[in-house]
Amino acid sequence: MARSKSSAGWLKEHFDDYYVNKAKQDGWRSRAIYKLQEIDEKDQLFSKGMTVIDLGAAPGGWSQWTTHQTGDEGRVFALDILPVEPFAGVTFIQGDFQEDDVYQSLLDALDGREVDLVMSDMAPNMTGNKGVDIPRAMYLVELCVDLADQVLKPNGDLLMKVFQGEGYDQLLKSLREKYQKVLTRKPKASRPRSKEIYLLARGKKA
């Protein structure tokens, strides 16, 4: 079957992508590493010994950067519906975050451990229909917020990929009630055509 023009265009963009090539040269698992690196360098997300949850972790770039920044005493709990090649310092759970049993598996792995940072690079499979895509994306965001409500320690932080659209303003309002400040970030490594931004909610209120 011939590839569609859109999929062929995506492949060309992918292989011509500066950050894809840079990730290969630098030994990182994905171009997404540079989004997190830029946010980290601006906002100092990490410190040694932190406990971090990485949602939408595959193929593992964000977890790689996190273990690099948190050191041998840090712990990363990563989750994705796709497999991730294991590496030191990361506990990986494969499954759909929307499923109750997978969510519970993550809580079981934490074993009561309080979390310093919840981060999510999750996104649904996009159809191109905003009326479908935005609600699906917002549902994942809401699940991530619920998890942070449950496991983040006081003054903990939440970093999430979001897509602006219906429900975005209400999300901001809700986060501002729960956290000391909420920042928006658009890393240079985000593809220009992408509507994604990242919300960084800092300092969970007790």
Swiss-Prot record:
Cross-referenced Gene3D superfamilies: Vaccinia Virus protein VP39
Main location: cytoplasm
Subcellular location: Cytoplasm
GO molecular function: rRNA (uridine-2'-O-)-methyltransferase activity
Function: Specifically methylates the uridine in position 2552 of 23S rRNA at the 2'-O position of the ribose in the fully assembled 50S ribosomal subunit.
HAMAP family tied to this protein: RNA_methyltr_E (MF_01547)
PANTHER family: RIBOSOMAL RNA METHYLTRANSFERASE, RRNA METHYLTRANSFERASE 2, MITOCHONDRIAL
EC number from the UniProt entry: 2.1.1.166
CDD domains: AdoMet_MTases (cd02440)
InterPro entries: RNA_methyltr_RlmE, RNA_MeTrfase_FtsJ_dom, rRNA-MeTfrase_E, SAM-dependent_MTases_sf
Keywords: Cytoplasm, Methyltransferase, rRNA processing, S-adenosyl-L-methionine, Transferase
Catalyzed reactions: uridine(2552) in 23S rRNA + S-adenosyl-L-methionine = 2'-O-methyluridine(2552) in 23S rRNA + S-adenosyl-L-homocysteine + H(+)
EC category name: transferase
A GO CC term assigned to this protein in UniProt: cytoplasm
Organism field: Hydrogenovibrio crunogenus (strain DSM 25203 / XCL-2)
Active site residues according to the UniProt entry: K161 (proton acceptor)
UniProt family annotation: Belongs to the class I-like SAM-binding methyltransferase superfamily. RNA methyltransferase RlmE family.
Coiled coil, from the record: none
SUPFAM superfamilies (UniProt xref): S-adenosyl-L-methionine-dependent methyltransferases
Record-given protein name: Ribosomal RNA large subunit methyltransferase E
Binding site for S-adenosyl-L-methionine: G60, W62, D80, D96, D121
